[in-house]
Amino acid sequence: APQRPVVILDIDEQSLRKLGQWPWPRTRVADLITRLTDLGAVVIAFDVIFAEPDRLSPVLAAEVFRDLDEETRNKLRALPSNDQVMADAIRQSKVVLGETGLPIVVPQSGAQPPAVGIAALGSDPKPFLFSFPGLLRNIPVLDNAAAGRGLFSIRSERDGIIRRVPTVMLAQDTIKPSLTFEMLRVVT
């Protein structure tokens, strides 16, 4: 059988019918990462953003379900968050997380994302790049675990047609790689 160098795992209607509505618990996403890695994936990328903590983490259940006894609450609080479980899976694989440029600056909690390793030689390229004043990124526990981060923002021309997908863009005055460009960096 011929090898397939690229496989796209699509969260489609059939997946949603079988596994439930999106967003899935981060533990399920962690299982996907682990399974893909076990199957030989050399790089895994997400073109979705995990911008908020998982609403299904055990510690949140301990607070939300009022009828739980204190012993059960304490057991739930002692479990790792679903985000930590996913971060652990990310660390065991080569995962590139997606980010998206925004037309406005949106305040986000947490530390700044890890530095991007892009150097520019010669004149300043910033005036020639697609530019986004804002950036929507993943929560820090996931960001810090990832092998890379890349933008999956695209812009159409005035007629609504997308003719170019740049390899680098500008977001919050920082040169950032596209998702696919960052995947190439991480895999090599």
PLM-predicted stretches and their roles:
Residues 1-188:
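Non-transmembrane functional regions of envelope-associated proteins
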